[in-house]
């Protein structure tokens, strides 16, 4: 549930560096969120010293103890950049921190919490600024290319101050909106992630009435639970969005357009039914039970089964190749599968050849009111020019993922904690290793058992949401027939001549669940591999490029010649992250250029050279 906000002092921080290197500080700005007091720093040590002075001043002025002090610093994408210059590897290693799969969400160093706002609002600072009416300026070229000869001007400092102001206003706006969403009489602590915020809002407003138990004190407690076997089975059925080159890779397809569905997941959450955690059960895996439950509109099922397609059955189910890659081209499936895809498969001529296990539960609609309320509210805000509508879009899209959180391995970096575990004879409960391998100077522990289990997990919601979405996407793909060339989660690229057929299945518009154009003017399309494609005109103008994991532009922002051509060597420009720095003995936050080539296409004849 939402947590009451404790007394705190908050700052935003932004640093400008000479080039893509977090260590090469030009200057930076720290801004008090509430008073807008600003401090310009030219060394990272000065920044940390100033923050400690403000912390001491805050404690003394308000009579707050060290234990109760809350000093928060927010940066945008800061644990991916700014903080990598502000701190050393050892400072981060010894910090009390929360991370998710290697991405640090918050780290407490010398009594100050350093947070990353981008884990809470996963859009760029320029998008936030535009929404809030505080437009972000363009990064001066001298900082992008690292030209120190031009020096630092007041205009540069004002640019950085504006970045802090955008973040400051974003924090205050989201705090106000979050409080209203939760119907809270008091101020609330902002969560660390978008999914956490969405879950807390849903819990505060739309928690299912029958989800409760009576504790030993004979008090009602809002809690839901089921046997682990049901959640584990649904976790096995949980698959993300379908991303596939449907046509022939590297082939040029002319006359191509693309459409994507507005708020795919929120739409399915509004329109569909989901399995009730509190009522999950199982029965004998007999086909008579399977058919009976499948026909019941008040029941949701999930089953461990084998499906085989008929002669004309199109492939659409998620399988894996022998190499472990996701595959969408097979008509035989074995494993756990949710009802939406089971029904769709049977409609397409698939047969159940083996039924191993059969689970089911009552069907409920836990998200209908949530989505309808916030979608309506967003439309009203948009009409009034209220910038807070940006937060609603993020909130609606993030909720389903919270229910699909997997166990998090308990990792211990802090040397004192490691020593304490060794001294108390508990080392056998952990895997002991070193980040730096044979050098053996950077130890860490990972718990053998006792992984952190998220309290909000119910894969029945997460797996059914994505299952419904994949069925909706496949229906659109089938409507496009042999004109479908590529798909990605909620979008499909297809021959424009197939649009009339598509409109029999989908509706074009701006409303929730309708589809809208990404590329409306027909042009040439090349799909290389998942998350890598190109739209290009007959005159060789690159209209849109998607290539995950590589840099499409150089330091000046100019498109590199090889962008969108996977037959050529590509490069990614980034900075060395915390764990990478330890593992590879590289300077934390330093610029890193990595060569990347496609295993499928590198060295082949380029389709752009015809």
Language model feature labels by segment:
Residues 2-12, 20-27, 31-610:
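Conserved acidic
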